[in-house]
Structure formats: C-alpha cells, structure tokens
Amino acid sequence: MEITIQSVNFDATEQLKTFVEKKVKKLERFSDDIIQAEVILKVVKPETANNKEAAVKLNIRHKEAFAGKIANTFEEAVDLCIMALEKQIQKTKEKKDR
C-alpha cells in the first residue's frame, strides 16, 4: 500500500509521520485490496482547543473509503479516523460475503 501524508499550514514531525504510517498500515489487516492511502493533516483554527483535523482517504479495489475527524491532537484525530475506516471496511466485507 502506498501512503501519502500531507500537512497543511504546519510542518509534520518525523515522529508524527511515523505514527500515521503505522496506524494506516494496520488497516491492511482488514483488507488486502487497499491500494493507496492519502492522509491530510491540518490545523483548523489555531486559537481554539479542538483544532487538529485528520482526513484519511483509502483507495480500495473498486471503491473508496473516507474518514475525517477533528480532535485536540493529530494522534487522537488519526486514531478516530482509523476506527471509522475499520468499521467501513468491515461493513463492506459483510455486504460482500452475503
């Protein structure tokens, strides 16, 4: 799986990039058909508390999955996105198995 990480309005640290890659790679446990993952990290409103936004778009063979979440930290936002994508992938698998 090819993973692209884009940071908007700030420079992402190597530690953050490594964290994101590690989390996104875990999605391969749920589907072997994931071709590409695009992650966008962005600071929404610097003056507010919940201002870190993460959006993850997966290109899965013949379909796409997307999750976008806002939280206090990028790590928390990415975790929420990954959990949402896991549910989407599992629902798709269940429909496919019927």
Where are these regions (language model features)?
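N-terminal, polar/charged subdomain of small-to-medium soluble alpha/beta proteins
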Residues: 1-98
